[in-house]
Amino acid sequence: MLSLPHALRFLLASDPDALTLVLGVVYRAIARHLINQAGLARATGATGAVTLVQRFGSALNLNIHFHMLFLDGVYLTEGANSPTFRHVAAPGANELQALVEQIAARVGQVPGTSRPDRARHRERLAGVRRTTRPAG
């Protein structure tokens, strides 16, 4: 499971394109890590995952987060032979911390997710709220 900072949760809840970009960044970072750990290159290794984007917490509070299940290894896809599976050992605490930091840095580079971008997004939403009148 990957939780996100509160400000980013609000942004992603209201911007499906940004949510898609962030999910892609997370997937690619983990897949690349697995492929590298297997000693393969992206051209010769492939992994897979299933992701559930959960939008609410148990108290029905807004809580965008990802539940991701990755293969515990990589398929070697080189040549005409059938793909061969290579198991990758579970990451240690330091390795996991480095991967989380890498994901955080990359998510911060996604357009719309930096602090100034989030501030502009809040201003835009506030403007929409001010100009929207209840029907009736």
Predicted regions located by residue number:
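Beta->alpha loop/short-helix hinge microenvironment recognizer with preference
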Residues: 1-136
